Swiss-Prot record:
Induction: Expression is down-regulated when the stress-activated mitogen-activated protein kinase (sakA) is deleted. Mg(2+) 2 binds at D58. This is Multi-functional prenyltransferase ltmE. The gene is ltmE. It comes from Epichloe festucae var. lolii. Residues 299-314 have a biased composition (Basic and acidic residues). Mg(2+) 1 binds at D58. The lineage of its organism: Eukaryota, Fungi, Dikarya, Ascomycota, Pezizomycotina.
Length: 788
């Protein structure tokens, strides 16, 4: 699929629509299009250039993550390119106007000066708080009106001057409307949950220190100099929340909404033409939509977004002006009402209980680090919070979708994590699904993913900022799903052709792409949350390579601040011609006080498994040559032959072992680059799809035991690892089409030495029958490593 946008300006126009002022032109000068089509076209292009360029710069200044519930242009293209394009568009339209109509060019330049003068005045107030703002009530209101007349009114006056060929007959009308438009914007920013959803932040103006109309009213009506002034000065979350409560008090809110209603009198036609239908509700104004005089339809009432949910999310996250879309109101789920939640049946939950609890229970016991009470707690958590979110059982009447968490289609992937002396812990990853997943209502299973993330982040007490940010960045909108769905096969085939260099690739049937995996590390009786996102969906719908898109996103993520590591990764992948190789994005989800140690991980693929490739990607082309990295490479070199199933060893570091053909979608290797806030040196982990280099699970088990012996781990004793797997998943010698093993990862750090993870793919039986292997929860089936 070809890119849908060429630059930040075109990207914004694609979101908002071309010729934004067309209805105004037709209302104020209905004959212009027929009488002077050239001037008509020029006026529309001038207004688009001025309006959209201002939006591009505003979004940068406000650090807005979203625009109309999609990533803002600077998030996608970067701040420098976005600002440069905005000014380039303005310069071009000025030059064009000077050539085609010098009279209009003069009006355009005058208006641009006034617009920027008003914006400058607003930014000075933002910088200085109340220090340079008038003290007297009437002077404060007059200052606000003057700023509004310049910043917003000049835009509409420009339209009138262009229509009147430099005349002033529309000035009074459009000055009034400019004030209305500014009031409307300021009120929506505080009082409209729908607007907050589209912008990805509640009360963005207040959090940025903007002296908007509700702030001015609060200063006048409530004499709230102390509370509001402190919020403007400190910009702290606590002070901002106190100020927001003042702005949302009935006295301030009703005064603002009454002023907005009064400003619209006599402008009804212009108000209707302007649109901006986000709803605002007042405690004393009968819930009317105060953005326009017409009545709210029942459909609009049904679509109303619960402000309390957004506020609760902001409170939980301590959100700043960059806080992003709450999971329950993220893209595409606006069509799913609460009654449309696709809960699965108790029969389905019972099926997953029978399938999953014995597997996790067996692995917990085999690790010998979990007490009986801890195992019971972990299994109870699994049953209460995970199993109801695995979707319908396979081939049941309501089954619509097969999980993409494993190659077998099983929706939960257990893994065993070994480190240091070989001590093992359990982890599992699952794809949230429900009975509507895969249907026309929710073909990509977005709703259960966002619902589960919200519930788990609240339950586990984690800071949701990164979750919200990446939902906004990577989860597709409804329109993007509709765009991608029929073209998915074409996109996937194009990816395979590019990565393999072959035209004869076969793309397996894939009705969708995954949007979210949830992982839980089991630490004693507690759980550590990680979340994975697929960047390929945005690559498919925007045409922006996954690496470029991801790096732009990471540079704007709140409380990350690691542009140096991001730049290093982007430069390295560009050198390797791998800008489309980013396959996964993962985040640690931790309590707010632990956020400085949280990781963001970027996963990339390679089409070679030679150790030369490993060395290049582990050192990022020689950029990371610290002692820990080099020691890790030495340790990995010692076990590399066993991970690739080469029992005789590998002499030539340039040797790349061919894949077995297990899956045409499988790459040779994966690497993850782990970045923490402020740390410029990423940790690098290599992932080996062992099922692509071995004939069967029996061989893989033997290779792992050789691997563990090389590291002097107790699981390397003959038959030990194999017994662990068989006690959980059944015989390693089987005739199924899919493997029990899903891959292995390897990383080395100075603190804990080698850290290796073994990923498992439980078999997916059809019809809900457990026919392949019957689990037993008696001690004889559990491998005891306590005396080894």
């Amino acid at each position: 699929m070809k890119p849908t946008t060429r630059c930040p300006f075109d990207y914004l126009v694609s979101q908002c629509g071309k010729h934004h002022f067309k209805t105004f032109v037709q209302l104020l000068s209905p004959l212009l299009q027929d009488e002077d089509p050239d001037r008509y076209a020029l006026i529309l292009d001038i207004m688009d250039a001025v309006h959209f360029s201002a939006i591009l710069i505003d979004d940068i200044a406000n650090q807005s993550a979203l625009r109309r519930n999609q990533p803002a242009a600077h998030v996608v293209f970067g701040e420098t390119e976005t600002a440069t394009r905005a000014y380039l568009v303005l310069l071009r339209v000025v030059n064009r106007t000077m050539r085609e109509n010098p009279v209009l060019a003069g009006e355009l330049l005058n208006s641009l000066e006034e617009i920027h003068q008003g914006q400058d005045e607003s930014l000075v107030w933002r910088r200085d708080g109340l220090e340079t703002f008038p003290v007297a009530d009437d002077e404060r209101l007059a200052a606000y009106v003057r700023m509004s007349r310049l910043k917003t009114g000049s835009l509409f006056v420009l339209l009138g001057r262009l229509l009147a060929n430099g005349g002033t007959e529309f000035d009074d009308l459009l000055v009034r409307f400019g004030l209305y438009a500014q009031l409307q914007h300021d009120c929506k920013n505080i009082y409209s949950p729908e607007y907050a959803l589209n912008k990805g932040s509640v009360a963005e103006d207040l959090r940025n220190g903007e002296l908007s109309y509700p702030v001015v009213v609060a200063l006048i009506e409530n004499k709230a100099e102390g509370i509001v002034g402190e919020a403007l000065r400190t910009r702290s979350d606590g002070d901002t929340e106190q100020a927001l409560r003042v702005l949302e008090s009935p006295a301030v809110k009703d005064a603002c909404l009454h002023a907005l209603e009064a400003a619209s009198v006599g402008l009804e036609d212009l108000v209707e033409a302007w649109g901006r239908r986000e709803k605002m509700r007042s405690d004393t104004l009968d819930g009317d939509d105060l953005t326009r005089p017409s009545t709210i339809t029942q459909h609009e009432q049904d679509d109303h977004v619960d402000r309390a949910a957004i506020d609760a999310k902001s409170d939980a996250s301590g959100s700043s002006n960059k806080s992003l879309t709450p999971p329950e109101t993220a893209p595409t789920t606006d069509t799913l009402s609460e009654t449309a939640v696709g809960d699965i049946s108790s029969v389905d939950v019972d099926y997953w209980t029978r399938r999953c609890v014995p597997i996790i229970g067996s692995l917990l016991k085999s690790c010998r680090v979990y007490s009986e009470a801890e195992r019971e707690t972990q299994l109870r958590f699994l049953q209460e919070h995970v199993l109801p979110n695995l979707g319908p059982r396979p081939s049941s009447p309501g089954s619509q979708i097969q999980s993409m968490a494993t190659f077998s289609g099983f929706p939960l992937q257990p893994s065993i994590n070994l480190s240091g002396s070989g001590q093992a812990k359990v982890r599992y990853t699952f794809e949230p699904l429900d009975s509507l997943s895969g249907t026309e209502v929710d073909p990509f299973a977005l709703a259960p993913a966002q619902r589960v993330l919200e519930k788990l982040s609240t339950l586990l007490g984690v800071w949701p900022g990164w979750i919200d940010a990446l939902i906004a960045a990577y989860h597709p909108t409804r329109e993007e799903v509709e765009q991608l769905h029929p073209n998915l096969h074409e996109y996937l085939r194009g990816v395979l052709v590019r990565t393999t260099g072959r035209q004869d690739v076969q793309v397996p049937p894939m009705p969708r792409m995954w949007v979210c995996f949830v992982a839980l590390d089991l630490e004693g009786a507690s759980q550590a949350l990680k979340v994975y996102f697929d960047p390929k969906i945005k690559e498919a719908v925007t045409g922006i390579p996954s690496c470029k898109y991801t790096c732009q996103i990471l540079r704007t993520v709140d409380r990350f601040g690691n542009a140096k590591a991001v730049d290093m990764l982007e430069q390295f992948l560009a050198e390797e011609h791998s800008i489309g190789a980013v396959e996964l994005i993962a985040i640690d989800c931790v309590p707010e006080e632990m956020q400085p140690s949280a990781r963001i991980k970027v996963y990339v693929h390679t089409m070679s498994n030679s150790f030369q490739t490993v060395r290049k990607y582990m050192t990022m082309g020689g950029r990371c040559m610290d002692p820990a990295t080099l020691e890790g490479l030495e340790n990995l070199h010692d076990v590399w032959y066993s991970l690739l199933g080469e029992s005789q060893g590998i002499v030539n570091e340039e040797y790349s072992k061919p894949l077995t053909g297990f899956s045409s979608m499988q790459h040779h290797l994966y690497f993850s680059y782990e970045m923490t806030p402020g740390n410029a040196d990423p940790g690098v982990k290599v992932y080996i799809p062992v099922q692509s280099y071995a004939p069967d699970d029996k061989t893989i088990a033997q290779n792992y035991e050789a691997n563990f012996r090389q590291l002097n781990w107790p699981w390397g004793e003959p038959g030990v690892y194999e017994a662990v797997i068989e006690s959980a998943l059944g015989p390693v010698k089987h005739s199924r089409a899919t493997f029990l093993h899903g891959g292995s990862s390897f990383i080395f750090s100075k603190g804990r030495g080698v850290y290796q993870s073994i990923y498992l793919d439980p078999p997916l039986e059809e019809g809900g029958n457990i026919a392949v292997f019957e689990h037993h929860d008696d001690q004889d089936t559990i491998v005891d490593l306590g005396n080894m």
